[in-house]
């Protein structure tokens, strides 16, 4: 039951998978997707649904829907039907269909009655409107869609069509899917429209809110057709923007620019039948068929109306050099063949080719030349071409099939109808293929066995070598083809072409003479269509003349051709050619012969040396300036800022004679490129190319250097390439925390927004002026006329009028003051961008490029000059103070107005009459104040008197009434005895209230009584009753008063307690109020506390590193001063006890700690002299002074005499440490080169020295050396020796052979001293390397010389590409001299260094590990010598976590795993170069050791003398030497700057040249500076341009500084202001983006070997080596001589296996491996889709095979571990060519492999 359930479940899953992967479901899915590609056809469909109503409207809806569906059906049919697909898939189809139909439809909509025939029939098919609706929906459905591009869907459809078998089912199902989606979409649109119609509230509220808009809405409804036509027009214009017009496109000239190489050029006007972008399989790809105009025999050019078929022949001559050194180019000789009868190209081509061929001449089938790509198409480019071929014995589609082969096959099929291929069944093909491969495999096995047998029996070399196959054309006689013509041979045997033969000029006499022996290729006769009646094919014998022609037409020289018998020649040419002999008078044969002389496929390619418009503006490519730019750059203009015509320095005159052939008339121009402030839609497109090729690109920034497709946004690592400044961010965060002011922020935001709006408006105005034709000319003339009118007409006229009016008013005129101000006004001509030139000089091309006129010190007419600051000036100064700037200038507008900025809003001029009116108002005010002063005083006093009288009166009345009321109250109450005793108490609030209420009652009673008495009309009974009532009330009052009196006595006693309760109540109430307030404000209080705490903590964290580094350095400095440097002064106080040298004790601690971690520090960084100098400074007794040193030196006697200097030997002999004359013995080198021995142990890497030199060339070694990681380039850690070649110093604890530092050895003081002295002596090993014979890099000398070092190179690179922000290119001086240095030795070292300078580069370094040093600085003592502090403190504190992690990120293949957390130091020696007679100073930043380039012996000696003299000067007076050297540098620098005038491509210094080379060749970059700096720099540039042209620039300079126009902090005071300084200050930020750089082949090979090598840290090598033979057999030992001296380890490992396949040749070895990979066993051929087969093996047999595989698993692993390097080296280089027909692995795309699954082997 369970089995049945699982079976059912498996069937369900398989059924679901089949349904999902079925053709119908996929077609429905793709069809449903195409519904969402909404295009212009939907506009017509919606218009028919929305607009048309009534009976005609329904018919229009039906016709629109029918046309819509029919158009989509045609699109789907075009997928299956190739001709329709070709017709509709071309871009020009849209042009041809859209333009006339668009015009027709547009005019028809605008003129409604244009096609109204007024037919009364009911047959609506005759109505033209319904037909047009049908056509609209049909035609526009065929166009490309624009909202969701249909090209993406078309690609998906094409991919599935490529893989699908049942294509028609897929097309129908996709159409059904589209139909379903379309019906659903239209139903949804209909429901939305119905809902809008039914919902009246939407129509009333949304559309018509008031009566104002009812008219507009009605008009909108009436003009709906017009709106739809406008939308249609916009969409069609959008299409035409992407589509090139077939008529108005730019025709490209076919000028060939290949750098002077000779080419086979052929002119043809016919289009290539199979245009392709890929290169033909030729040796030289510079030989290209191109379309160009040709000069015939040095005459005039061919007319455009006349076209010729021209065949070019070269007259190759030997190149002869003239006296001038120029070479004569080879002359081309041409002759006419045929003149075309048609005059126009357009009528020659068929209409289909003209309209529908999208691969026509205006398509950019070419590459743009740059430094990396020199040719049109790269050599050896892989060719992706789909065609059927046999793979695994079956017909497969290969995407790397040679296109030339397929083209040739198609041509044969067309011309030879009998040529048909019988389709053999797959079973037969597979068996045939299997048999062939089995035969090949057996042959290889036989060859393999024969080779082993030959080695075993010691046969001769002839029997071992591989046999070659020859082409035999006669088996009986065993006659073979000559080696030159044998296709099975290759290499030298086929011959070499040294130079092409010299063709004679082919004339008519030459053709008539040799016409009888003309040969025509048989293959040409098959392929080319020609009239067979024109000549008769006959085969005759060859005569002598024909053989002579063969020699002339041969491509091989006579010396290289092998001698062939006449019989063999006849047989060969019978096999290849038919001889055609015709009448010599018939000229048709000659023409036909010349027409089809060769098979060639014309691929349209054009010139690739195109220059962009930007390069034309810059004028850098002087050679190509005459060319018309072929690449459209961003819209820009070249603005010449400054033209240097005169020399400005003395150095120019001094070094004038150094300039060779300098043109004095040539002027240096400094120009700027002004870009237009608009989006760049050109995007480096080639002129005439199709914009539709790049329509998927999206500009998502205002200005974008690289345009990406939205499909690849996920591939971009960073959308924005910017530098992340952490410290700047911290400062900004702190500033925002500490200085928050919302009001100021709001005001600043408003100001910024306003300024942005104004800036945008200005840019728009400038761009509009620049965009219109002739607008700049009109504007320029208007500005010049306004300037002349203002300066010479309007302002003088105003001055005259003003002064004449002053004279009429009897005032003094102000002629002098006004004329002075008028003369001060300057009208400076500026460029369109605002760069100032001068008053008289107009900018270059100012009529076309534009002009600005800047008015400096503008003249304002004043009524008088002696007045104070006027109001407008005060307001203006106030504004200027707020802004922090003063702008005493303005720009002139076209209308004569003034603006602060070009194209800005007009400024309000100060009024002439405003100060006059203000003065008049002031005087009127003064008169008014004087005349009405008395009246004001009287009025004020009268009002005061009346107020006082009123107040007195009111006060008197109030007091009188109050006294009267009090008297009445006293009279009413009982008199209280004033003199009797009484208790005074305080009443509480309740008592007071009761008393007040009693008083009120009492008063009421009294009033009632008086009223009763006065009323005499009342009866007496009532009076009596009232009297009784009053009595009772009075009695009650008395009783109540008595009771209250008792209560008051008791209350008086408890007064204190009641007060206390009252106060406690008040406190509680206040506490409650405070508590609620606290609860409400507690959140803000907590936030405030957290902010304060976070600020404090953050500031503390920031200051921790600074404090710790400061404390640490202070402590180390004090320790050093205390324990080391005061030893000389306090030497007398040192006891005679056992002394400890502090820096050696620290070494002891460090080594003991490092021994636990298996790390030992390298002490080689100390120089020998320094060690002995420090030891000699210790003042102790003679016995203990050198006891430890003596033991060490006696232990290593072989070292002392060989290594120590003579002075130290003499000193040691005097002290009695060791004998002077000791025998020289070879030192046991404890640091054996294990890596080299390991390489020798593996025989396949035991290469000779020549092979190693080929493996890594000098260029490659230089590249490797340049990639070194430098930690500290200063002299503190530079080494005083150089290692051997291929010698790597490693940590001692990793090897058992190095027994000096054993982990079990106790590190005592004696061993420390021994180690110290041994390392110091052993550090330099040998002064001279015996293998090379030159002195090593004497870094000791560099410690005492003045060194010019490049700062910043030692900083760690955090990226895998070069970051120029790290490098600092300025030079720092270091004078390093000590009194204990011997000058004699110094001079000797200098001499040797200069002599061997040019040979130092021969010392090769194998890799990064060669320069590993422990980063141990001897507690900074070397730094004390140089007085130089460390730059980066983080290196000193956390080297384990910082340095090597970043190094491992950049080069993970270099650093071993065990060394990842260790320190090493690597130094690059940058030696200075003092030029003697050589021109120019070159401060290098990348060379490891500089040489004297191209110097002869005299110059070398002079250079050495210069260096020695400079050293002497430094010894005597270091400051003067430094100053002299500075002058030296300045002179050389000036000399190099003058060289720039000769050629613009020369740079100021080598640093700039290298930087420019880096930026142009290896990086695409963007330069930008900070926004706050931008305007300041531009303002400075503008002022500089004006000051340069003025004779007396002082006044303008001072005024510009006062105005704030020129900022002094940006002035370039330094001469050498390099890029590094700009980058450090944040002005310029260069951010290179990584590019794909083509790796060096030698480097790839070396890295491939390096992967297979086991690192020697993991590969332990024993102390002693044992030599073993490679194989035990004696016979093989003799034959394999190169494996005899192989050293192996004592322990047997898996790397010693013998590889049998290496006996085979490399070619057979590769073939053998590939044949092994194929499964060539017998197999039953069955259908691929059949899942069940009856012949199923049992389970036991399968398990047995698995067991067999498991047995050989270990052996297989061992075998593969040794085979892997061989596979890597050979297969990677040859696999692509062998399998995929690709000749270069770099261009092979792995994506294309992943697109197609592997084919299963059945």
UniProtKB/Swiss-Prot annotation:
Where in or outside the cell it occurs: the entry states: Plastid, Chloroplast inner membrane
The UniProt entry lists membrane topology as: Multi-pass membrane protein
Tell me the GO BP annotations in alphabetical order.
protein transport
Which superkingdom does the taxonomy of this entry point to? Eukaryota
Name where it mostly resides: plastid
Which residues does UniProt call coiled coil?
A: none
Alphabetized, the UniProt keywords read: Chloroplast, Membrane, Plastid, Plastid inner membrane, Protein transport, Transmembrane, Transmembrane helix, Transport
Task: Give a yes or no for keyword RNA-binding in this entry.
Answer: no
| Membrane-spanning segments | 19-39, 68-88, 91-111, 133-153, 176-196, 227-247
| Keyword presence, Membrane | yes
Q: One GO cellular component from the entry? A: chloroplast inner membrane
Under the heading Pfam families, the entry gives:
Ycf1
Question: Assembly state and interactors?
Answer: Part of the Tic complex.
Q: What else is known?
A: There is a partial copy of the N-terminus (positions 1-343) of ycf1 in the inverted repeat (BAF50686).
Q: What's the stated role of this polypeptide?
A: Involved in protein precursor import into chloroplasts. May be part of an intermediate translocation complex acting as a protein-conducting channel at the inner envelope.
* Assigned protein family: Belongs to the TIC214 family.
Protein name, as recorded: Protein TIC 214
């Amino acid at each position: 039951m369970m089995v049945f359930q699982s079976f059912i479940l498996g069937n369900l899953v398989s059924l679901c998978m089949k349904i999902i992967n079925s053709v119908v479901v996929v077609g429905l899915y793709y069809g449903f997707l195409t519904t969402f590609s909404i295009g212009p056809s939907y506009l017509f469909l919606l218009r028919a649904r929305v607009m048309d109503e009534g009976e005609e409207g329904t018919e229009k809806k039906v016709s629109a829907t029918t046309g819509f569906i029919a158009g989509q059906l045609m699109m789907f049919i075009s997928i299956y039907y190739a001709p329709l697909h070709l017709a509709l898939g071309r871009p020009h189809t849209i042009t041809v269909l859209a333009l006339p139909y668009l015009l027709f439809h547009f005019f028809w909509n605008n003129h409604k009655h244009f096609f109204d025939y007024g037919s009364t029939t009911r047959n609506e098919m005759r109505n033209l409107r319904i037909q047009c609706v049908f056509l609209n929906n049909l035609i526009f459905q065929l166009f490309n869609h624009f909202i969701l591009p249909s090209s993406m869907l078309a690609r998906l459809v094409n991919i599935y069509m490529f893989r699908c078998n049942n294509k028609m089912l897929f097309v129908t199902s996709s159409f059904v899917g589209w139909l379903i989606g379309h019906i659903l979409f239209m139903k949804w649109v209909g429901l939305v429209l119905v809902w809008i119609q039914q919902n009246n509230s939407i129509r009333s509220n949304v559309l018509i809110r008031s009566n104002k808009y009812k008219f507009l809405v009605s008009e909108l409804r009436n003009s709906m057709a017009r709106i739809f036509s406008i939308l249609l027009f916009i969409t069609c214009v959008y299409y035409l923007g992407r589509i090139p017009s077939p008529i108005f496109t730019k025709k490209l000239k076919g000028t060939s620019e290949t750098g002077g190489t000779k080419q086979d050029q052929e002119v043809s006007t016919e289009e290539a039948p199979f245009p392709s972008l890929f290169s033909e399989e030729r040796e030289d790809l510079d030989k290209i068929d191109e379309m160009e105009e040709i000069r015939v025999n040095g005459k005039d050019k061919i007319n455009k109306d006349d076209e010729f078929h021209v065949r070019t022949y070269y007259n190759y001559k030997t190149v002869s050099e003239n006296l001038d050194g120029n070479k004569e180019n080879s002359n081309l000789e041409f002759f006419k063949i045929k003149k075309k009868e048609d005059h126009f190209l357009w009528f020659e081509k068929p209409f289909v080719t003209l309209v529908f061929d999208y691969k026509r001449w205006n398509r950019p089938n070419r590459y743009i030349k740059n430094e990396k790509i020199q040719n049109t198409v790269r050599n050896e480019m892989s060719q992706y071409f789909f065609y059927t071929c046999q793979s695994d014995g079956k017909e497969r589609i290969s995407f790397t099939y040679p296109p030339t082969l397929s083209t040739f096959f198609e041509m044969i099929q067309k011309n030879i109808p009998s040529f048909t291929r019988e389709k053999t069944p797959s079973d037969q093909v597979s068996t045939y293929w299997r048999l062939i491969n089995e035969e090949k495999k057996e042959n290889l096995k036989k060859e393999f066995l024969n080779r082993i047998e030959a080695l075993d029996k010691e046969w001769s070399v002839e029997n071992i070598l591989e046999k070659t196959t020859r082409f035999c054309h006669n088996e009986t006689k065993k006659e073979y083809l000559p080696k030159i013509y044998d296709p099975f041979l290759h290499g030298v045997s086929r011959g070499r072409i040294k130079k092409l033969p010299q063709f004679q000029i082919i004339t008519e006499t030459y053709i008539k003479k040799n016409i009888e022996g003309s040969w025509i290729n048989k293959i040409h006769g098959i392929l080319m269509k020609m009239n067979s009646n024109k000549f008769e094919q006959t085969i005759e014998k060859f005569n002598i003349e024909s053989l002579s022609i063969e020699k002339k037409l041969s491509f091989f020289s006579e010396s290289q051709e092998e001698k062939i018998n006449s019989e063999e020649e006849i047989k060969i040419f019978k096999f290849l050619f038919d001889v055609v002999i015709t009448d010599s008078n018939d000229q048709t044969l000659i023409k036909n012969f010349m027409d089809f002389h060769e098979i060639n496929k014309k691929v349209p390619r054009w010139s690739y040396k195109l220059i962009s418009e930007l390069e034309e503006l810059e004028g850098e490519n002087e050679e190509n300036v005459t060319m018309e730019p072929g690449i459209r750059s961003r819209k820009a203009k070249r603005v010449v800022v400054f033209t240097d015509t005169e020399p400005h320095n003395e150095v120019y005159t001094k070094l004038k004679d150094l300039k060779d052939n300098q043109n004095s008339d040539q002027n240096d121009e400094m120009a700027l490129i002004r870009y237009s402030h608009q989006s760049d839609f050109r995007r480096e497109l080639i002129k005439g190319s199709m914009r539709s090729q790049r329509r998927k690109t999206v500009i998502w920034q205002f200005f974008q250097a690289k345009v990406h497709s939205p499909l690849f946004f996920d591939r971009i690592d960073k959308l924005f390439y910017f530098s992340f400044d952490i410290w700047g961010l911290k400062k900004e965060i702190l500033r925002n925390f500490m200085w928050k002011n919302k009001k100021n922020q709001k005001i600043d935001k408003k100001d910024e927004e306003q300024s942005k709006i104004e800036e945008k408006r200005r840019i728009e105005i400038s761009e509009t002026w620049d965009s219109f034709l002739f607008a700049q000319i009109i504007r320029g003339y208007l500005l010049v006329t306004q300037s002349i009118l203002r300066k010479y007409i309007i302002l003088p006229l105003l001055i005259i009028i003003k002064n004449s009016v002053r004279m009429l008013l009897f005032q003094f005129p102000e002629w002098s003051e006004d004329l002075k101000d008028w003369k001060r006004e300057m009208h400076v001509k500026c460029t369109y961008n605002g760069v100032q030139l001068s008053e008289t000089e107009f900018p270059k091309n100012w009529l076309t490029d534009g002009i600005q006129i800047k008015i400096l010190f503008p003249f304002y007419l004043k009524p008088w000059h002696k007045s104070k600051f006027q109001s407008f000036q005060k307001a203006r100064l106030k504004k200027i103070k707020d802004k922090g700037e003063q702008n005493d200038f303005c720009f002139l507008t076209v209308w004569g107005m003034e603006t602060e900025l070009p194209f800005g809003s007009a400024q309000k001029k100060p009024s002439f009459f405003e100060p006059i009116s203000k003065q008049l108002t002031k005087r009127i005010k003064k008169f008014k104040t004087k005349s009405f002063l008395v009246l004001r005083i009287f009025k004020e006093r009268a009002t005061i008197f009346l107020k006082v009288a009123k107040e007195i009166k009111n006060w008197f009345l109030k007091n009188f009434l109050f006294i009267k009321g009090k008297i009445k109250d006293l009279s009413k109450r009982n008199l209280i005895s004033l003199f009797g005793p009484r208790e005074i108490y305080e009443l509480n609030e309740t008592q007071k209230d009761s008393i007040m209420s009693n008083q009120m009652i009492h008063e009421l009673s009294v009033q009632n009584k008086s009223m009763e008495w006065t009323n005499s009309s009342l009866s007496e009974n009532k009076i009596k009753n009232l009297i009784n009532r009053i009595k009772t009330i009075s009695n009650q009052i008395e009783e109540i008063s008595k009771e209250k009196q008792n209560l008051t006595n008791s209350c008086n006693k408890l007064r204190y307690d009641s007060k206390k309760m009252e106060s406690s109540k008040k406190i509680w109430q206040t506490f409650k109020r405070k508590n609620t307030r606290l609860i409400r404000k507690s959140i803000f209080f907590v936030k405030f506390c957290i902010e304060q705490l976070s600020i404090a903590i953050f500031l503390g964290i920031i200051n921790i590193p600074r404090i710790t580094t400061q404390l640490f350095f202070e402590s180390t400095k004090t320790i050093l001063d205390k324990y080391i440097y005061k030893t000389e002064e306090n030497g007398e106080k040192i006891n005679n006890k056992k002394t400890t040298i502090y820096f050696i004790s620290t070494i002891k601690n460090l080594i003991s700690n490092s021994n636990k971690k298996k790390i030992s520090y390298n002490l080689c960084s100390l120089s020998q002299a320094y060690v002995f100098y420090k030891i000699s400074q210790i003042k102790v007794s003679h016995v203990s002074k050198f006891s430890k040193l003596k033991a060490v030196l006696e232990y290593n006697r072989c070292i002392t005499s060989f290594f120590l200097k003579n002075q130290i030997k003499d000193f040691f002999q005097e002290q009695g440490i060791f004998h002077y004359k000791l025998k020289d013995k070879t030192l046991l080198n404890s640091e054996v080169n294990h890596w080299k021995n390991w390489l020798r142990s593996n025989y396949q890497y035991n290469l000779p020295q020549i092979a190693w030199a080929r493996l890594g060339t000098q260029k490659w070694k230089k590249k490797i050396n340049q990639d070194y990681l430098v930690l500290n380039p200063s002299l503190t850690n530079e080494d005083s020796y150089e290692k051997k070649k291929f010698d790597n110093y490693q940590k001692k604890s990793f090897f058992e052979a190095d027994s000096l530092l054993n982990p079990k050895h106790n590190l005592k003081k004696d061993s420390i001293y021994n180690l110290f002295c041994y390392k110091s002596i052993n550090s330099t090993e040998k002064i001279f390397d015996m293998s090379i014979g030159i002195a090593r890099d004497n870094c000791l000398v560099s410690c005492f010389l003045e060194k010019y070092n490049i700062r910043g190179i030692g900083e760690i690179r955090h990226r895998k590409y070069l970051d120029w922000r790290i490098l600092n290119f300025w030079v720092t001086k270091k004078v390093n001299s000590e009194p204990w240095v011997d000058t004699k030795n110094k001079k000797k070292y200098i001499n040797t260094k200069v002599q061997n300078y040019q040979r130092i580069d021969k010392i090769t370094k194998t890799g990064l590990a060669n320069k590993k040093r422990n980063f141990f600085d001897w507690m900074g003592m070397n730094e004390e010598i140089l007085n130089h502090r460390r730059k980066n403190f983080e290196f000193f504190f956390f080297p384990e976590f910082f340095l090597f992690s970043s190094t491992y990120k950049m080069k993970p293949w270099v650093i071993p795993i065990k060394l990842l957390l260790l320190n090493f130091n690597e130094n690059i020696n940058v030696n200075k170069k003092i030029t003697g007679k050589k021109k120019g100073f070159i401060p290098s930043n990348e060379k490891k050791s500089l040489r004297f380039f191209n110097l002869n012996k005299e110059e070398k000696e002079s250079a050495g003398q210069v260096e020695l003299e400079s050293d002497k000067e430094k010894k005597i007076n270091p400051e003067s030497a430094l100053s002299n050297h500075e002058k030296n540098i300045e002179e050389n620098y000036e000399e190099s700057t003058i060289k720039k005038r000769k050629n613009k491509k020369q740079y100021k210094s080598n640093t700039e040249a290298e930087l420019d080379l880096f930026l142009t060749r290896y990086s695409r970059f963007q330069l930008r500076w900070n926004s706050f700096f931008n305007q300041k720099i531009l303002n400075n540039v503008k002022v500089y341009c004006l000051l340069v042209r003025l004779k007396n620039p002082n006044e303008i300079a001072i005024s510009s500084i006062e105005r704030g126009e020129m900022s002094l902090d940006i002035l370039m005071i330094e001469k050498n202001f390099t890029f590094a300084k700009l980058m450090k200050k944040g002005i310029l930020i260069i951010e290179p983006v990584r590019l794909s750089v083509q790796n060096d082949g030698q480097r790839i090979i070396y890295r491939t070997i390096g992967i297979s090598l086991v690192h020697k840290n993991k590969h332990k090598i024993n102390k002693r080596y044992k030599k073993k033979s490679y194989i035990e057999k004696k016979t093989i030992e003799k034959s394999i001589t190169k494996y005899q001296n192989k050293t192996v380890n004592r322990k047997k490992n898996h790397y010693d296996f013998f590889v049998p396949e290496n006996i085979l040749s490399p070619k057979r070895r590769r073939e053998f491996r590939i044949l092994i990979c194929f499964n060539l066993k017998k197999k039953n051929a069955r259908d691929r889709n059949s899942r069940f087969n009856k012949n199923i093996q049992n389970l036991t047999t399968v398990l047995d095979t698995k067991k067999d595989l498991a047995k050989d698993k270990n052996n297989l692993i061992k075998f593969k571990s040794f085979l892997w390097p061989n596979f890597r080296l050979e297969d990677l280089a040859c696999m692509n060519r062998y399998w995929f027909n690709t000749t270069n692995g770099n261009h092979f795309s792995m994506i294309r492999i992943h697109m197609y699954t592997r084919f299963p082997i059945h």
